């Protein structure tokens, strides 16, 4: 969305869309184009503000920040992935989109998670993959190339509250645009600790090859369709380790 666009124009445009659709209640998605930005820096700003958050960055593809939950459900058993797919299809079927500009508008995202705990794995002989949770984020910031979009998903049960949602997404837009003035400046006192951690991580990555090959083999066998490999590492430090400084270095 052009930076010179005013809230009055945005409010008028989407309110007209809302009235023309005769919408009363249900799942809405409101999208607003924002200036291109550094997602890691932005995630640091929002990180402690929400109980649930997720961050994913790909250099040449779609990257996102997800905050808070609009809809979520947990699935277990052998057909948990099929259950999650059905949940996703249901969500996308229900979403009613509202947007100011449609050019390059990305789709909403439902994110899948599994949590691995040592005790659970030891007691889970017949099911090496724990249950999964599927989440439709309430707030979603998506970056594709140089285009960035801010989305809000919300279960609207009263059409009178639609304008409140428009005010809310505009408020997030303003926070994002003005984030540099809102950041607290920090001293990079632990740069040496970060360098030490990166050296440790580079050495540890060599030991991950076996796990990666085993994961790829599961996909090739058709046991899994896609995977995100995770492995716990133990690292001792006497200083506070800033995860965002690690990501930025």
Show where each model-derived region lies.
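Signature of the chorismate-utilizing enzyme
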Residues: 1-249
């Amino acid at each position: 969305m052009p930076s010179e666009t005013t809230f009055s124009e945005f409010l008028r445009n989407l309110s007209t869309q809302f009235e023309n659709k005769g919408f009363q209640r249900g799942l809405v998605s409101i999208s607003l184009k924002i200036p291109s930005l550094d997602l890691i820096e932005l995630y640091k700003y929002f990180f402690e503000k929400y109980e649930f958050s997720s961050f994913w960055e790909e250099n040449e593809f779609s990257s996102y920040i997800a905050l808070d939950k609009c809809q979520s459900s947990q699935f277990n058993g052998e057909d948990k992935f099929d259950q999650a797919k059905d949940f996703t299809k249901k969500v996308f079927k229900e979403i009613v989109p509202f947007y100011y500009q449609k050019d390059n508008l990305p789709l909403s995202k439902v994110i899948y998670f599994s949590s691995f705990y040592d005790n659970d794995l030891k007691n889970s002989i017949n099911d090496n993959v724990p249950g999964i949770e599927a989440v439709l984020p309430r707030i979603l910031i998506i970056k594709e190339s140089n285009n960035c979009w801010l989305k809000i998903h919300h279960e609207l049960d009263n059409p009178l509250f639609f304008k409140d949602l428009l005010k809310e997404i505009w408020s997030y837009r303003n926070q994002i645009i003005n984030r540099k003035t809102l950041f607290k400046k920090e001293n990079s006192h632990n740069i040496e600790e970060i360098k030490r951690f990166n050296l440790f991580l580079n050495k540890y990555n060599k030991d991950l090859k076996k796990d990666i090959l085993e994961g790829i083999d599961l996909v090739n066998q058709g046991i899994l369709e896609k995977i995100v490999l995770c492995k716990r590492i133990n690292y001792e430090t006497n200083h506070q380790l800033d995860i965002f400084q690690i990501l930025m270095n």
